[in-house]
Design a protein with these regions (language model features):
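Terminal leader/tail segments of proteins
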Residues: 1-145
Length: 145
């Protein structure tokens, strides 16, 4: 895999976006928003890696839903979303299933977000992929009120 660029146009983790998620009055998890830290949008199928860590603990992929354009997807669906476009000025919501949610206070969120730049073919690359990868990773401490 070839890494070409990291262009931090915006913070990946959106300020003041952390909240617990309630379903039928029960706290079933939490959510926060992320943005592409890049000047172009991407199709969701171009996401090579989306990993979330909260307070130093990795969130299992099966517990994460990715929400964009009024739709909600599992991490396993992302490689097949060839027609779902993520505009660079839109925030996506990450929903995490965690019965009881998070406690109020500060929580450190680390997002690993690597995207394949489908328009940046790397000739001669014999590794897994022949496309440059955009590093849109980010981390931030948010306060849950």
């Amino acid at each position: 895999m070839t890494f070409v660029m990291k262009l931090p146009f915006v913070d990946t983790v959106v300020d003041d976006s952390l909240a617990n998620t309630f379903v039928n009055g029960k706290k079933l998890g939490y959510e926060f928003q992320i943005r592409l830290s890049y000047y172009r949008g991407h199709y969701l199928s171009c996401i090579e890696d989306l990993t979330i860590m909260v307070d130093g603990e990795k969130v299992e992929a099966n517990d994460i839903n990715f929400c964009l354009n009024g739709k909600e997807f599992t991490i396993g669906q992302i490689p097949y979303l060839i027609s779902e476009f993520w505009n660079c000025n839109e925030a996506a919501t990450i929903k995490v299933y965690l019965p009881g949610g998070l406690e109020e206070g500060k929580h450190h969120i680390d997002v690993t977000l690597l995207l394949r730049n489908a328009y940046m073919f790397i000739p001669g690359n014999t590794e897994k992929h022949n496309y440059a990868v955009l590093d849109s990773c980010g981390s931030k401490t948010l306060t849950l009120r």
